[in-house]
């Protein structure tokens, strides 16, 4: 908590720790969810276990490899690019602050406490945020939301009644496309030769299948 007060003192216009507490109380009174404008929620992300998300270094490498030029561009690309910019800058400032606090704390136990708090609590939130926006840019927002809902249903289902493996994000678009393309040609363009040679019972059976 003291570290968070220090963050507020440095980053906002509150000149004292007492003022930062007032600022903190105001922030706590607001229902701020960074995922709501994108159709998700913090609770929806919380279904994914902490070890699901890649490390900060891996996520930064992914961002740099895929979206470096877009993030450096002065033009607005998408809300996801903007959110990534802000989250990356926030993490950089937090690392600078944690380093400064660690270097100025004489007690080794206090230094370890600061480092562990940042890595465990703030690090997880940053990893969740980066993963969400990177995935939305890579797979599409609707696919990511569908995955979060599917995983939430899977994880809440008792093991005896669910598939052994959790849903995989990268397979959702491919599976959906294959299903849509695989069924529609049979319904729309049946073979004329087949239609003439089939018995009435077979035709009725096919008609029922096409409605599924």
Curated annotation (Swiss-Prot):
Name the source organism: Hepatitis B virus genotype B1 subtype adw (isolate Japan/pJDW233/1988)
The cellular component terms of Gene Ontology attached to this UniProt record, alphabetical and capped at eight, are: extracellular region; host cell; host cell cytoplasm; host cell nucleus; T=4 icosahedral viral capsid
| Spans annotated as 3 X 8 AA repeats of S-P-R-R-R-R-S-Q | 184-206
Instruction: Say which domain of life the source belongs to.
Output: Viruses
Q: Which Pfam families match?
A: Hep_core_N, Hepatitis_core
| InterPro entries per UniProt | Hepatitis_B_virus_capsid_N, Hepatitis_core, Viral_capsid_core_dom_sf_HBV
Question: What's one GO MF term for it?
Answer: DNA binding
Name the Gene Ontology biological process terms.
microtubule-dependent intracellular transport of viral material towards nucleus; symbiont entry into host cell; viral penetration into host nucleus
What family does the entry list? Answer: Belongs to the orthohepadnavirus precore antigen family.
Q: What is this protein called?
A: External core antigen
UniProt-listed SUPFAM superfamilies: Hepatitis B viral capsid (hbcag) (SSF47852)
Q: Which spans of this chain does UniProt mark as sequence repeats?
A: 184-190, 191-198, 199-206
Q: Give the Gene3D superfamilies listed for this entry.
A: Viral capsid, core domain supefamily, Hepatitis B virus
The entry's function note states: May regulate immune response to the intracellular capsid in acting as a T-cell tolerogen, by having an immunoregulatory effect which prevents destruction of infected cells by cytotoxic T-cells. This immune regulation may predispose to chronicity during perinatal infections and prevent severe liver injury during adult infections.
- Give the signal peptide range: 1-19
Propeptide position ranges: 184-212
**Where does this polypeptide localize?**
Secreted; Host nucleus
Region HBEAG, residue ranges: 25-27
Region annotation Disordered: where it falls in the sequence: 165-212
């Amino acid at each position: 908590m003291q570290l968070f007060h220090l963050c507020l003192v440095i980053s906002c216009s509150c000149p004292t720790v007492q003022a930062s507490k007032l600022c903190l109380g105001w922030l706590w009174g607001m229902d701020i969810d960074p995922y709501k404008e994108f159709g998700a929620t913090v609770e929806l992300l919380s279904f994914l276990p902490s070890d699901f998300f890649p490390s900060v270094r891996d996520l930064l490498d992914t961002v740099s490899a895929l979206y470096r030029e877009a993030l450096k561009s002065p033009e607005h690309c998408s809300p996801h690019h903007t959110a990534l910019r802000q989250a990356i800058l926030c993490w950089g400032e937090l690392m600078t602050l944690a380093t400064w606090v660690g270097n100025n704390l004489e007690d080794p136990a206090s230094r370890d406490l600061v480092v562990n708090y940042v890595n465990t609590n703030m690090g997880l939130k940053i990893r969740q945020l980066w993963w969400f926006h990177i995935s939305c840019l890579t797979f599409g927002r609707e696919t990511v939301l569908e995955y979060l809902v599917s995983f939430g249903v899977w994880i809440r289902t008792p093991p005896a009644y669910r598939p052994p493996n959790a849903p995989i994000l990268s397979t959702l678009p491919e599976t959906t496309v294959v299903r849509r393309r695989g069924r529609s040609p049979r319904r729309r363009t049946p073979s004329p030769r087949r239609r003439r040679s089939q018995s009435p019972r077979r035709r009725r059976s096919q008609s029922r299948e096409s409605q599924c």
